[in-house]
């Protein structure tokens, strides 16, 4: 059973939405669920080095890298690279896969569950 998490929000926007999505991804993976993450809109900053978390806030870029290191595939909207996030135009770090809407569509179609954050 595959679960796709689509993230949209900026990592450090004053809410816990993105943080909770990453926590859920970690727990699902730990529970043996096949987890996939697709980053679009301002959430693409999770795939970029250079974002410093505010004091007292967990480093969500590090959380994303840890998920990748554990084998969770993370694909990142290519169009959003130029248009979205605090670091517009900055490339993505190794392990975060540059992707397309067609690949997002394929993941949606082949996933048992799709959750959006």
PLM segments and residue spans:
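A glycine-rich helix N-cap at a beta->alpha junction
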Residues: 53-81
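Short glycine-enriched, charge-decorated loop/helix-capping segments at active-site entrances
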Residues: 50-55, 91-94
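Short internal beta-strands
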Residues: 25, 35-40, 74-78
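Histidine-anchored nucleotide/phosphate-binding helix
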Residues: 17-30, 37
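Residues at the starts of beta-strands that form the adenosine-phosphate
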Residues: 2, 30-36, 73
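C-terminal structural segments of small proteins and small subunits
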Residues: 84-117
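Short, glycine-rich nucleotide/cofactor-binding loops
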Residues: 3-19, 47-52
């Amino acid at each position: 059973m595959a679960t796709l998490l689509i993230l949209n929000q900026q990592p450090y926007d004053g809410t816990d939405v993105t943080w909770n999505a990453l926590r859920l991804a970690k727990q699902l993976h730990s529970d043996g669920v096949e987890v996939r993450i697709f980053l679009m809109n301002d959430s693409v900053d999770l795939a970029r080095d250079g974002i410093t978390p505010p004091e007292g806030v967990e480093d969500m870029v590090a959380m994303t890298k840890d998920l990748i290191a554990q084998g969770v595939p993370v694909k990142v909207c290519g169009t959003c690279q130029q248009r979205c996030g605090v670091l517009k135009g900055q490339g993505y770090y190794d392990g975060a896969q540059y992707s397309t809407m067609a690949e997002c569509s394929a993941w949606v179609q082949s996933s048992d569950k799709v959750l959006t954050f």
